[in-house]
Amino acid sequence: MARSYGGRVLAAMTLLGIAAAVLAALGAQLLFQLQAGRAELRGLRAEGLGQELGAGPGLPEDAAGTLLPLAAALAALVLVLGFTCLLLAALCGHLGAELARGPGPRRSDWFLYDCRLLRHVALGLFCCGISVYLAALSIYALLLFEIETGAAAASILGSGTLVLVAVLTHTLLRAARAARRGLHELSPPSFEDDLARPAEVSKASPRAQPQQGIHRRTPYSTCPEPGDPFGSMATATAPAALEGGWESSLPASRMHRTLSAGLGHWDGVTHEMRRMLGHRPGSMGKDSTLV
């Protein structure tokens, strides 16, 4: 089964933390070796062998005295960079693991995806630590070996340091450009598919609401006039017809047209009868003879 985005990030941060711990250990070891070499050099000078050291094939005394503090400072910088990278990796991994234990399996994925800048900083510190360590190691090679051997080792280590710095700069610039593009232009991880489902449901729910409103709407609305027996009869028979199953057999629009046509015919008959009764000749006394 393929790992999730958070699992892959946690595995990468674990490996980065292990490498940063190894780098910090190498920096501390180099720092102690330089300190021991400096104490040994001072002991040789105290014994009266300074002239022999100055005349030997190694570096001159003034150059060695200048390069030793520089190499020690670089080794201390390597130690600081390694510990900083280790702490960042451990912090990011710990927070991601704690969020994964909480409710919602995608919380840690979102956290690790949002803190990608922190991961880039940790990786940059690690690469800078390696470059500084190679520079300090080249100086230590000049101090430890003879001039020819030390120069060859220092040149190789220095060229490797320059190549590593160039690759590091190019990689960090590309990572910064990718971070500026935003979430929509980056390659989306697998957990973004889960967010599309609530959006589709929210788009489909307004479509279902008008359909429910159509079913709830009555197919007709008539208001019978007072004293109109036909209107009251139509109003009384319409619900009975709907209960008898007309709604299932006829559409709402067709039923509405049929009822409107029938009611219109009876309205014409009642209107004609009222007009004839309204224009009766004679007075009230003559009306009694008609009865």
Curated annotation (Swiss-Prot):
Name the source organism: Homo sapiens
* Full protein name: Transmembrane protein 221
Keywords, ordered alphabetically: Membrane, Transmembrane, Transmembrane helix
Q: How does it sit in the membrane?
A: Multi-pass membrane protein
PANTHER family per the record?
A: TRANSMEMBRANE PROTEIN 221
Q: Name the segments for region: Disordered.
A: 189-219
User: Which Pfam families does the UniProt record give?
Assistant: Jiraiya (PF15038)
Q: Membrane-spanning residues where?
A: 12-32, 70-90, 125-145, 153-173
Q: Which InterPro entries match?
A: Jiraiya (IPR029201), TM221 (IPR053101)
**Where is this protein found?**
Membrane
Cellular compartments per GO CC: membrane
